[in-house]
Amino acid sequence: MKKGLIMANHRIDRVGMEIKREVNEILRLRVNDPRVQDVTITDVQMLGDLSMAKVFYTIHSTLASDNQKAQIGLEKATGTIKRELGKNLTMYKIPDLQFVKDESIEYGNKIDEMLRNLDKKD
């Protein structure tokens, strides 16, 4: 039983990594929307039944308006992305995609800045 669970989790991780790679490629080559030009997919988390993928992204801008535009652009491009995934992946059903801004990079940068400021005070 335990081995089957490990194998299932490994497959979920593999599918997530493949979707991450493919979505990055699709955004770069197939989606012509300027709102998603600077978007990079950082992680994909799959539901256990592979019916949904939570796609985490970052954008190379700190402006709130750019972040909002990127989210809207990704939501508009979801149909194109799913269609391209269907062509490139050998899956029975392509999962639904939910795009979520990855806050971890900004959080890490904020911590780095705080640490640098501490060093300057000493």
UniProtKB/Swiss-Prot annotation:
Q: Which Gene3D superfamilies match?
A: 3.30.300.20
Q: Where in the cell is it found?
A: Cytoplasm
**Got any disulfides in this one, which pairs?**
none
| A GO cellular component annotation in the UniProt record | cytosol
Which GO molecular function annotations are given, in alphabetical order? ribosomal small subunit binding
UniProt cross-references to InterPro entries, sorted A to Z: KH_dom-like_a/b, RbfA, RbfA_dom_sf, Ribosome-bd_factorA_CS
Q: Give the Pfam families listed for this entry.
A: RBFA
Task: Keywords in alphabetical order, please.
Answer: Cytoplasm, Ribosome biogenesis
Q: What does this protein do?
A: One of several proteins that assist in the late maturation steps of the functional core of the 30S ribosomal subunit. Associates with free 30S ribosomal subunits (but not with 30S subunits that are part of 70S ribosomes or polysomes). Required for efficient processing of 16S rRNA. May interact with the 5'-terminal helix region of 16S rRNA.
The identity of this protein, by name, is Ribosome-binding factor A
Q: What is the protein's species of origin?
A: Streptococcus agalactiae serotype V (strain ATCC BAA-611 / 2603 V/R)
